[in-house]
Design a protein with these regions (language model features):
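Polybasic/polar functional segments that serve as interface/processing modules
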Residues: 1-118
Length: 118
Protein backbone atom coordinates (compact mmCIF):
# COMPACT_ATOMS: atom_id res chain seq x y z
CA UNK A 1 0.00 0.00 0.00
CA UNK A 2 2.69 2.51 0.96
CA UNK A 3 5.03 1.65 -1.90
CA UNK A 4 2.63 3.14 -4.44
CA UNK A 5 0.67 5.63 -2.33
CA UNK A 6 -0.71 8.27 -4.71
CA UNK A 7 -3.54 9.81 -2.69
CA UNK A 8 -1.55 12.73 -1.27
CA UNK A 9 -0.70 16.02 -2.97
CA UNK A 10 2.56 16.29 -1.00
CA UNK A 11 4.85 14.02 0.99
CA UNK A 12 7.04 15.17 3.89
CA UNK A 13 9.51 13.17 5.92
CA UNK A 14 10.53 14.05 9.45
CA UNK A 15 14.33 13.90 9.23
CA UNK A 16 16.11 12.44 12.22
CA UNK A 17 14.69 10.07 14.80
CA UNK A 18 11.05 10.08 15.88
CA UNK A 19 9.73 8.36 18.99
CA UNK A 20 7.35 5.89 17.35
CA UNK A 21 5.43 5.46 20.60
CA UNK A 22 3.63 8.65 19.57
CA UNK A 23 0.16 8.17 18.22
CA UNK A 24 -2.02 10.28 15.95
CA UNK A 25 -2.30 13.26 18.31
CA UNK A 26 1.41 13.34 19.15
CA UNK A 27 2.49 13.12 15.51
CA UNK A 28 -0.08 15.70 14.36
CA UNK A 29 1.10 18.03 17.13
CA UNK A 30 4.71 17.52 16.00
CA UNK A 31 3.77 18.42 12.40
CA UNK A 32 1.97 21.55 13.57
CA UNK A 33 4.30 22.83 16.29
CA UNK A 34 7.79 21.63 15.37
CA UNK A 35 7.54 21.76 11.56
CA UNK A 36 4.93 24.55 11.32
CA UNK A 37 2.91 22.62 8.73
CA UNK A 38 -0.83 22.00 8.55
CA UNK A 39 -1.63 18.36 9.37
CA UNK A 40 -5.17 18.77 7.99
CA UNK A 41 -4.10 19.02 4.35
CA UNK A 42 -3.91 16.32 1.70
CA UNK A 43 -0.33 15.53 2.76
CA UNK A 44 1.39 12.31 3.80
CA UNK A 45 3.80 12.74 6.73
CA UNK A 46 6.43 10.03 7.28
CA UNK A 47 8.27 9.30 10.55
CA UNK A 48 11.06 6.80 11.25
CA UNK A 49 12.40 5.37 14.51
CA UNK A 50 16.00 4.75 15.61
CA UNK A 51 16.25 1.24 14.19
CA UNK A 52 15.20 2.46 10.72
CA UNK A 53 13.17 -0.69 10.06
CA UNK A 54 9.84 0.84 11.06
CA UNK A 55 7.94 3.88 9.87
CA UNK A 56 4.69 5.57 10.76
CA UNK A 57 2.71 7.54 8.23
CA UNK A 58 0.11 10.14 9.11
CA UNK A 59 -2.52 11.18 6.57
CA UNK A 60 -5.67 13.31 6.94
CA UNK A 61 -8.62 11.96 4.95
CA UNK A 62 -11.33 14.69 5.11
CA UNK A 63 -13.11 13.16 8.11
CA UNK A 64 -10.26 11.74 10.18
CA UNK A 65 -6.65 10.64 10.35
CA UNK A 66 -5.16 7.47 8.97
CA UNK A 67 -2.11 6.18 10.84
CA UNK A 68 -0.13 3.51 9.02
CA UNK A 69 2.69 1.50 10.56
CA UNK A 70 5.14 -0.52 8.51
CA UNK A 71 7.88 -2.83 9.75
CA UNK A 72 10.42 -4.22 7.32
CA UNK A 73 11.21 -7.90 7.75
CA UNK A 74 14.72 -7.38 6.36
CA UNK A 75 16.84 -4.31 5.80
CA UNK A 76 16.34 -0.71 6.82
CA UNK A 77 15.14 2.56 5.36
CA UNK A 78 17.81 4.99 4.15
CA UNK A 79 16.47 7.80 6.31
CA UNK A 80 18.12 11.24 6.50
CA UNK A 81 19.44 11.64 10.06
CA UNK A 82 21.31 14.93 9.93
CA UNK A 83 18.50 17.41 10.55
CA UNK A 84 15.40 17.80 12.69
CA UNK A 85 13.14 19.25 10.03
CA UNK A 86 10.37 18.19 7.71
CA UNK A 87 11.58 17.76 4.17
CA UNK A 88 9.38 17.67 1.09
CA UNK A 89 9.84 14.71 -1.25
CA UNK A 90 9.22 14.43 -4.96
CA UNK A 91 7.26 11.38 -6.14
CA UNK A 92 10.56 9.87 -7.38
CA UNK A 93 12.28 10.41 -4.02
CA UNK A 94 9.31 8.82 -2.26
CA UNK A 95 9.58 5.73 -4.49
CA UNK A 96 13.32 5.52 -3.86
CA UNK A 97 12.77 5.71 -0.10
CA UNK A 98 10.11 2.98 -0.17
CA UNK A 99 12.45 0.81 -2.28
CA UNK A 100 15.22 1.08 0.32
CA UNK A 101 17.31 3.65 -1.55
CA UNK A 102 18.60 7.03 -0.45
CA UNK A 103 16.43 9.98 -1.46
CA UNK A 104 19.48 11.67 -2.99
CA UNK A 105 20.73 9.44 -5.77
CA UNK A 106 24.08 10.76 -7.05
CA UNK A 107 23.88 8.68 -10.24
CA UNK A 108 20.27 9.47 -11.09
CA UNK A 109 19.58 11.63 -14.10
CA UNK A 110 18.96 15.20 -13.02
CA UNK A 111 16.09 17.14 -14.62
CA UNK A 112 17.15 19.66 -17.25
CA UNK A 113 16.61 23.22 -16.06
CA UNK A 114 17.99 25.21 -18.99
CA UNK A 115 16.58 24.34 -22.38
CA UNK A 116 18.18 25.50 -25.62
CA UNK A 117 18.21 24.26 -29.20
CA UNK A 118 21.72 23.88 -30.57
Amino acid sequence: MLNDFTGADKVYIACGYTDLRKGIDGLARMVQKQFELDPFTNTLFLFCGRRRDRIKDLYWEKDGYILLYKRLEQGAYQWPRSESEARSLTPQQYRWLMEGLKIEQPKAHRPVTELAVL
